[in-house]
Amino acid sequence: MLSTFEDILERDGRLVYTNVGTSMMPLLRERRDLMVIEKKGPERLHWLDVPLFKRDNGQYVLHRVMWVRKSDYVICGDNQWYLERGITDKHILGVLTQVDRDGKVLDMRSPKMRLYGLLEWLSYPLRACWLIGRSVPGAVVRRVKRYKMRHHAAA
């Protein structure tokens, strides 16, 4: 029987895993870096923490806390522009505490990695403009192609 992330965190107190996806690049390289995620305690998350959470649709996500609000968190991937709101403590399973990369250990609580998180946070407005700007031309091209296909098919 396969164990869920929740089962592993409950049993062992931590989860060691590789990531799938590019939303946390360059911090996490897809299928290359090992993540150590520790089970979340009763305390609230802190600004710039990187929690593992489970969306209401069952999808597991690891993104950075951009803002801590009274009843929820605003979370975003380091390589994303979309701010996800409404993530509450009930969604949070654990927090990224360590990244093992090419034999080097990156402690997420170290001053160096906290500074890295701060720089990611500060760069968010520029990153959002860049990523949105890159996606708009592609979306326009796709719409034009669909429009042409519909009108050629009708002719």
Language-model region placement:
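Extended hydrophobic leader/signal-anchor segments used for secretion and membrane insertion
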Residues: 1-155
